[in-house]
């Protein structure tokens, strides 16, 4: 990724839904489809979106926007966000519906009630403001129905956190600023927080934060946890632990591969390879404390990878030592006596090589 060239920002599903809803509302109330259609976002930005779909019939109008996530590897990039507007029941106000490809909330703990379409609060507000302004121009009450649909959203949702959060049937319509920042950590950390919120609301007493799929399989087998108890922590150990400090769950397991857990053991809370590295000299010192001879310690300090050190350390309980130190480092950040913390370290085959309580 070239440093000299800024990454291109994109637009959230919420921004696209707002633009589609505004265009459809204009058409429904007799103004025709604006193309492009401009919207007002929090923070003052006023993007305009080209319509990918514009159709209407008796009592309804429909508009679609193709989501452009910029240079972010967003799974919803290229999806068409469609809003269908209909006249509602007099006095009922604005009603949101989930069309095909948009999920329904089935578990408590999210900022939406169970049974509601997975259209988050900020996109709801932006859509409500946009259509209310159009209705007011026509001297009408805002008794309208907004249905959001996403063709293929059911399949896209399987590549998101939604099934684990209990959002079923499609994707969520998301966004707080309307803007997608490429490779931003905030979206992942937000998903971690929502996973913890749902676990707490469902009364779970044990969850596991996993670095990836290998550690997830291991922790589910060893700890006997169901899918609903798994938090996709990824590289954001610190983000998860800090949120758990304020929103505790009785028991938490952290599970990850040897290299990532070496970073955690050394006190690094961001485990991404571009933002933290395994300190080989520190790792060699752990081997020395386990009784390794000078030659092995020296070879370990010169190793290129943590995996190489693990192979050199055959016969020494290095995985267990790393698990203990990772638990101590995580415990310090967690800083909440209400939470029981343990750490699992796995090798590349998913075998547990360290388990510290």
From Swiss-Prot:
Its EC number(s): 2.1.1.195
GO BP terms: anaerobic cobalamin biosynthetic process; methylation
Keyword check for Methyltransferase: yes
Listed pathway(s): Cofactor biosynthesis; adenosylcobalamin biosynthesis; cob(II)yrinate a,c-diamide from sirohydrochlorin (anaerobic route): step 6/10
Disulfide bonds listed in the record: none
InterPro entries per the UniProt record, alphabetical: CbiD (IPR002748), CbiD_sf (IPR036074)
Single Gene Ontology MF annotation: cobalt-precorrin-5B C1-methyltransferase activity
Catalytic activity reported: Co-precorrin-5B + S-adenosyl-L-methionine = Co-precorrin-6A + S-adenosyl-L-homocysteine
Xref: SUPFAM superfamilies: CbiD-like
Keywords, in A-Z order: Cobalamin biosynthesis, Methyltransferase, S-adenosyl-L-methionine, Transferase
NCBIfam families: cbiD (TIGR00312), PRK00075.1-1 (NF000849)
Family to which this protein belongs: Belongs to the CbiD family.
Protein name, entry field: Cobalt-precorrin-5B C(1)-methyltransferase
Gene it is expressed from: cbiD
């Amino acid at each position: 990724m070239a440093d000299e060239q800024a990454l291109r920002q994109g637009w959230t599903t919420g921004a696209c839904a707002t633009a589609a809803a505004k265009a459809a509302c204009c058409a429904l109330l007799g103004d025709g489809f604006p193309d492009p259609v401009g919207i007002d976002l929090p923070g003052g930005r006023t993007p305009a979106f080209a319509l990918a779909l514009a159709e209407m019939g008796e009592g309804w109008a429909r508009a679609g926007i193709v989501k452009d996530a910029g240079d972010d590897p967003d799974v919803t990039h290229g999806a068409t966000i469609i809003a269908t507007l209909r006249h509602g029941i007099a006095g009922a106000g604005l009603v949101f519906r989930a069309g095909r490809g948009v999920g329904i909330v089935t578990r408590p703990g999210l900022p939406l009630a169970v049974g509601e379409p997975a259209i988050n609060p900020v996109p709801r507000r932006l859509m409500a403001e946009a259509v209310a302004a159009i209705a007011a121009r026509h001297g009408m009450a805002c008794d309208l129905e907004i249905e959001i649909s996403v063709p293929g959203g059911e399949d896209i949702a399987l590549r998101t956190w939604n099934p684990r959060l209990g959002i079923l049937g499609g994707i969520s319509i998301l966004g707080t600023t309307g803007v997608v920042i490429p490779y931003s950590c905030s979206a992942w950390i937000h998903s971690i927080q929502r996973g913890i919120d749902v676990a707490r609301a469902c009364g779970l007493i044990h969850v596991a934060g996993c670095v990836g799929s290998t550690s997830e399989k291991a922790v589910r087998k060893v700890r006997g946890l169901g899918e609903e108890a798994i938090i996709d922590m990824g590289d954001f150990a610190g983000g998860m632990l800090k949120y758990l400090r304020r929103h505790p769950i009785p028991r938490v397991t952290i599970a990850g591969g040897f290299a990532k857990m070496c970073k955690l053991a050394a006190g690094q809370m961001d485990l991404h390879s571009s933002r933290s590295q395994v300190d080989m000299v520190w790792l060699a010192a752990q081997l020395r404390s386990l009784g390794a001879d000078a030659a092995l310690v020296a070879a370990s300090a010169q190793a290129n990878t943590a995996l190489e050190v693990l192979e050199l350390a055959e016969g020494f309980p290095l995985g267990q030592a790393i698990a203990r130190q990772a638990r101590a480092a995580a415990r310090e950040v967690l800083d909440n006596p209400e939470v029981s913390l343990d750490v699992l370290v796995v090798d590349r085959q998913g075998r547990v090589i360290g388990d510290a309580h």
